[in-house]
């Protein structure tokens, strides 16, 4: 009987620990990343993304530089400096809900555009 109680107690401890860990991981902030250039193409990947107010998106220069990120009507979010080095990145934090269209100025004509939906 004592052995059976110990067995159940150990199972209960494992279950409670697992639930606690999963809740802790779920509460961590979501970190989104958009690649600038992918598979030899002049694209943002992904080109459409949804995040919550207060969350950040990191833009990472992946290939085929130079790239920048310009948000239509939101100069405060734009990054006009060109990224030349692979892995070069910058982060944008969205404080207000809305749809934020962006493009890479040197490659907008090639369709390097995207949108971030902030809910």
Predicted regions and their residues:
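Sec-dependent signal peptide recognition
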Residues: 10-18
